[in-house]
């Protein structure tokens, strides 16, 4: 079993036959060694008990009921006085039935078979290491008549075919004549000396490899191809490029085998592991019918064919060689179907034309064992809801619906009610929460102020896929999110869902505050560019907010067909006449007029501005000059207006703007002042 304190990671890879045997083999107290599954049966049709040495054997995988053997005898588990520890009649140990979740078995194959993941998956690891084509290896493994091939023996002794040089590919006649010759009855000894077929040939070649020599030779060849340079022939240059890519993959694969101490011949199986019974159960449903995992049927298929091959090899003198080769091919195909159904073409189906789910189908994909059961399983103190935009939130805050918040922090609220003597026990506290009393929301807000939450959006492809936020209560049933953090999550507000988790331990809370808060993850960890940038709705909002008359005062003032930005009034003769643009002393008056709907968001207006020489252009000529009766006059320019006295002294300066520009300016100014205040406070 996996101990979370001892095992910090999970890695899938190749293991040796000795390791498979160590996992599956166990020694009974009487010295008997069990673990090999030899019969393709599951349960007896009369007794409904597991068959001995079958796929659900209690001797191999443990008892179905804790402390009860196959005979029905009972022993107390863990009692040292109880003796013996197993039943001498049926050989079942008196242990906990949970052992059937991790106790494995094995099938001893009558012939070696290649692991289809390493042969057929692209790129093929076996073809890469042996530097041979996949088509040639398939002909060697599956003994196809149209694509039949065989390999020279690894033995260093001289052979007839080695002396004649018949393994050269220029001689095509060997493909058909030599296999027929060696499959003739009575030539077994001669055949085993001269040629090698099936997975045995591949295993011998893999076992004969020196990985360090392969690494050195591949590096030398890659350097030689790089020094040659382009030939001018496009076809040859592509061929050289493909060869260089192949050499790079071969060197990387070789380094991986050397670094992990994996032997290449482990890609050929002698022992086939059998999963624990609880991971491939047979369940009885209503009506007495049984539902079985597809893997059980695939295991039965392997055992049937393997036992048939064992019988043929036992009587090898009277068995034709072609029959043995065909049966070896059937065993290979049965193991391929068990590991990855359909990888070689047409998948295997049951009587209802339904495709069997192989081992690969069980563990891979969205509904596989890892993503659905282990990584995607439901956990306590977590919730899920749709996300909506929360523009009024701070960057490090998120809006949490009351319904979700009260469920996530219920235990903390109960503790707060009891500590403040508002509830005498847990039951009373739960009743107060169920009735949604006002004091409950007050305590909930106190709890949430000091407790961050984690938001995660699947798929979590990089570090910013899960970030920490300070939660605040919001109405509704959707999680509110600041739009600037959407890029890190790759989220938008068209129905995306996010999961919320509560870190419980002090270590998790400290990590969330120091490393995972959203305002501390402003740069992309991959390339270092800013990742909290305006996108989508924010860009459109900024455009609408700042869109206005970009051509100055002339565009609308003297164009009778484009006066939408001006206030107009209706005269007696049903004609619209121009009303001059309003003047405001400060931004608060302008925004107040907008809220009272006296002006529009993009309506031009004059806003009093401090005297600034950067605004006033000395060489600019005014468009208009208005004179008042008291001697004051107005010089109107393209984007500003100057009020001067009779002595030509500047009294006031007005700039031509809109409410949208004013709002954006105020937001930027407040942000800069807040940042400056924070910096001065920090120093």
Swiss-Prot record:
It is an enzyme of class 2 (transferase). Its EC number is 2.7.7.6. The keyword Magnesium applies. Zn(2+) binds at residues 69, 71, 87, 90. Mg(2+) binds at residues 492, 494, 496. InterPro entries: DNA-dir_RpoC_beta_prime, RNA_pol_asu, RNA_pol_N, RNA_pol_Rpb1_1, RNA_pol_Rpb1_3_sf, RNA_pol_Rpb1_clamp_domain, RNApol_RpoC1. Gene3D superfamilies: 1.10.40.90, 2.40.40.20, RNA polymerase II, clamp domain, RNA polymerase Rpb1, domain 3. Binds 1 Mg(2+) ion per subunit. Binds 1 Zn(2+) ion per subunit. It is found in: Plastid, Chloroplast. Its cofactor is Mg(2+); Zn(2+). In plastids the minimal PEP RNA polymerase catalytic core is composed of four subunits: alpha, beta, beta', and beta''. When a (nuclear-encoded) sigma factor is associated with the core the holoenzyme is formed, which can initiate transcription. Belongs to the RNA polymerase beta' chain family. RpoC1 subfamily. PANTHER family: DNA-DIRECTED RNA POLYMERASE, DNA-DIRECTED RNA POLYMERASE SUBUNIT BETA. This is DNA-directed RNA polymerase subunit beta'. It comes from Coffea arabica (Arabian coffee). The lineage of its organism: Eukaryota, Viridiplantae, Streptophyta, Embryophyta, Tracheophyta. The gene is rpoC1.
């Amino acid at each position: 079993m996996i101990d979370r304190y001892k095992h910090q990671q999970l890695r899938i890879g190749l293991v040796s036959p000795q390791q498979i045997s160590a996992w599956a083999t166990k020694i009974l107290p009487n010295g008997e060694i069990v673990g090999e599954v030899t019969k393709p049966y599951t349960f007896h049709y009369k007794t409904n008990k597991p068959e001995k040495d079958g796929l659900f054997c209690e001797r191999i995988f443990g008892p179905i009921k804790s402390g009860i053997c196959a005979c029905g005898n009972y022993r107390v588990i863990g009692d040292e006085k109880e003796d013996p520890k197993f039943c001498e009649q049926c050989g079942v140990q008196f242990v906990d039935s949970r052992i059937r979740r991790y106790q494995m078995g094995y099938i001893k194959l009558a012939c070696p078979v290649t692991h289809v993941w390493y042969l057929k998956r692209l790129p093929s690891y076996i073809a890469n290491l042996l530097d041979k084509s996949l088509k040639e290896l398939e002909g060697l493994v599956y003994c196809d008549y149209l694509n039949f091939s065989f390999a020279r023996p690894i033995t260093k002794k001289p052979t007839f075919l080695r002396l004649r040089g018949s393994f050269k590919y220029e001689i095509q006649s060997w493909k058909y004549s030599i296999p027929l010759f060696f499959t003739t009855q009575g030539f077994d000894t001669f055949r085993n000396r001269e040629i090698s077929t099936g997975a045995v040939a591949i295993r011998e070649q893999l076992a004969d490899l020196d990985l360090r020599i392969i690494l050195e030779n591949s590096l030398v060849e890659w350097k030689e191809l790089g020094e040659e340079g382009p030939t001018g022939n496009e076809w040859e240059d592509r061929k050289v490029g493909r060869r260089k890519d192949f050499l790079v993959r071969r060197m990387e694969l070789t380094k991986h085998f050397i670094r992990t101490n994996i032997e290449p011949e482990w890609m050929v199986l002698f022992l086939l592991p059998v999963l624990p019974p609880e991971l491939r159960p047979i369940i009885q449903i209503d009506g007495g019918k049984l539902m079985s995992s597809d893997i059980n049927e695939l295991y039965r298929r392997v055992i049937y064919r393997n036992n048939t091959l064992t019988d043929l090899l036992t009587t090898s003198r009277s068995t034709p060689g072609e029959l043995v080769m065909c049966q070896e091919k059937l065993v290979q195909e049965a193991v391929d179907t068990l590991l990855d159904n359909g990888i070689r073409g047409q998948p295997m189906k049951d009587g209802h034309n339904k495709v069997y789910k192989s081992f690969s189908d069980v563990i891979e994909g969205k509904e596989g064992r890892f993503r659905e059961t282990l990584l995607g399983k439901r956990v306590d103190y977590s919730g899920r809801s749709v996300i909506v935009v929360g523009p009024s939130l701070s960057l490090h805050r998120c809006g949490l619906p009351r319904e979700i918040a009260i469920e996530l922090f219920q235990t903390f609220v109960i503790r707060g009610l009891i500590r403040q003597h508002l509830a005498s026990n847990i039951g009373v506290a739960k009743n107060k929460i169920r009735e949604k009393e006002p004091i409950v929301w007050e305590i909930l807000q106190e709890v949430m102020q000091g407790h961050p939450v984690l938001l995660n959006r699947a798929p979590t492809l990089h570090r910013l896929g899960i970030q920490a936020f300070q939660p605040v209560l919001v109405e509704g049933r959707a999680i509110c999110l600041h739009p600037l953090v959407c890029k890190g999550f790759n989220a938008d507000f068209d129905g995306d869902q996010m999961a919320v988790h509560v870190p419980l331990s002090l270590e998790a809370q400290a990590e969330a505050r120091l490393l995972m808060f959203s305002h501390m993850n402003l740069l992309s960890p991959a390339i270092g560019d800013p990742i909290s940038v305006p996108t989508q709705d924010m860009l459109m909002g900024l455009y609408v907010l700042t869109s206005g008359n970009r051509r100055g005062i002339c565009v609308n003032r003297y164009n009778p067909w484009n006066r939408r930005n001006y206030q107009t009034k209706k005269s007696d003769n049903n004609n619209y006449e121009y009303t001059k643009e309003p003047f405001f002393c400060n931004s608060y008056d302008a925004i107040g007029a907008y809220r009272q709907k006296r002006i529009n968001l993009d309506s031009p207006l004059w806003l009093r501005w401090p005297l600034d020489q950067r605004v006033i252009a000395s060489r600019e000529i005014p468009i208009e000059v208005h004179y008042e009766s008291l001697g004051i006059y107005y010089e109107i320019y393209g984007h500003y207006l100057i009020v001067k006295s009779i002595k030509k002294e500047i009294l006031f300066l007005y700039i031509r703007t809109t409410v949208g520009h004013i709002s954006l300016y105020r937001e930027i100014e407040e942000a800069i002042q807040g940042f400056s205040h924070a910096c001065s406070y920090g120093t």
